[in-house]
Amino acid sequence: MNEENGGAGGKAYFEDTKKNNLKHIAALESDAGGFSPRGIAIDTTMGAYKKVLSWKPLLDPYFVQYIKIGGHGADIGYLADIGVPLMGFEPDGQKYFDYHHTADDTFDKINKRELELSAGVIGSLIYLIDTKGW
């Protein structure tokens, strides 16, 4: 939503959410590249955090190494003000600045398998929140 340009997109989304009284079950940000999964950061109640932590074995096939408190991402941060649980998907960041904001930051550089694993983690989180709740 553009944290690189002052976060105006995230703030506008938050203002629209409040204005229209939109309900969010959760917000998830993925803003560190399309690399293989490493972990999930979560900002919510301790009870919800423990529930997500209990799902770790279900995320093991995607190579998720940790689920930690804190570190959701700048674009969704405003939503915390209205009680929305926030999550950040954290991929392996070793190659991030090899591509990010460079001429090489193109879709053909993405490793298909890494992107599939990352999508699997995000899709699984959505499914688990939907079926098991917070």
Label the predicted regions:
Residues 1-52:
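Acidic/histidine-rich catalytic neighborhood of metal-dependent amide-processing enzymes
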Residues 35-134:
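Active-site-adjacent substrate-binding region
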